[in-house]
Amino acid sequence: MEQPRKAVVVTGFGPFGEHTVNASWIAVQELEKLGLGDSVDLHVYEIPVEYQTVQRLIPALWEKHSPQLVVHVGVSGMATTVTLEKCGHNKGYKGLDNCRFCPGSQCCVEDGPESIDSIIDMDAVCKRVTTLGLDVSVTISQDAGRYLCDFTYYTSLYQGRGRSAFVHVPPLGKPYNADQLGRALRAIIEEMLGVLEQAEGDISCCRQL
């Protein structure tokens, strides 16, 4: 019997500040060219750097696609590696977006938990990707930055009950090019799907015992 195709949503961000070309969206476009194989329906979206758009768009993407996994990709001017973020944070959003706006409450979800962890074991994903011998270094972080990246991640984790991931990439050429970032994203997402399936298989086995 043929396995049903999995829906995977991957987002990058549009321009903001000094990032007139956002490496995250370039990397996602490279991923789209490569694809994730015949068993995955890949849906990519560019997200404006706007709090209110994120609050509207992220729930809509979850509702539209019912995805197995949503992966958000953002650029960090401080990053020199491709970084897997473990969690999103609810409070502390003071930076103005492209519309010169920030939430009056400075939080994502009123009365939401302080932080939400991804259900994906990022340490396991990092170890698996590292063994593949890519020409890209992959590391782990627990602080996505309290700006639109963190805001988007928390919103998605809240909406998807933890079935989200966030990947920070460096600016283009510092040190990786678009092709390297696209291939790294593909490897990371494939490993995330593997870790997710393994975890769900373990849960299923426990229920049958």
Swiss-Prot record:
Which domain of life does the UniProt lineage start with?
Eukaryota
Q: Which Gene3D superfamilies match?
A: Peptidase C15, pyroglutamyl peptidase I-like (3.40.630.20)
Q: Name one Pfam family in it.
A: Peptidase_C15
Localization per record: Cytoplasm
Q: Name one GO biological process term.
A: proteolysis
- Catalytic class of the enzyme: hydrolase
Q: Could you name the active-site residues?
A: 85, 149, 168
One MF annotation (Gene Ontology) recorded for this entry: pyroglutamyl-peptidase activity
Keywords of this entry:
Cytoplasm, Hydrolase, Protease, Thiol protease
Return the GO cellular component terms, semicolon-separated: cytosol
* Subunit composition and interactions: Monomer.
> What is the name of this protein?
Pyroglutamyl-peptidase 1
Q: Which organism is it from?
A: Mus musculus (Mouse)
Q: Lineage from the top down?
A: Eukaryota, Metazoa, Chordata, Craniata, Vertebrata
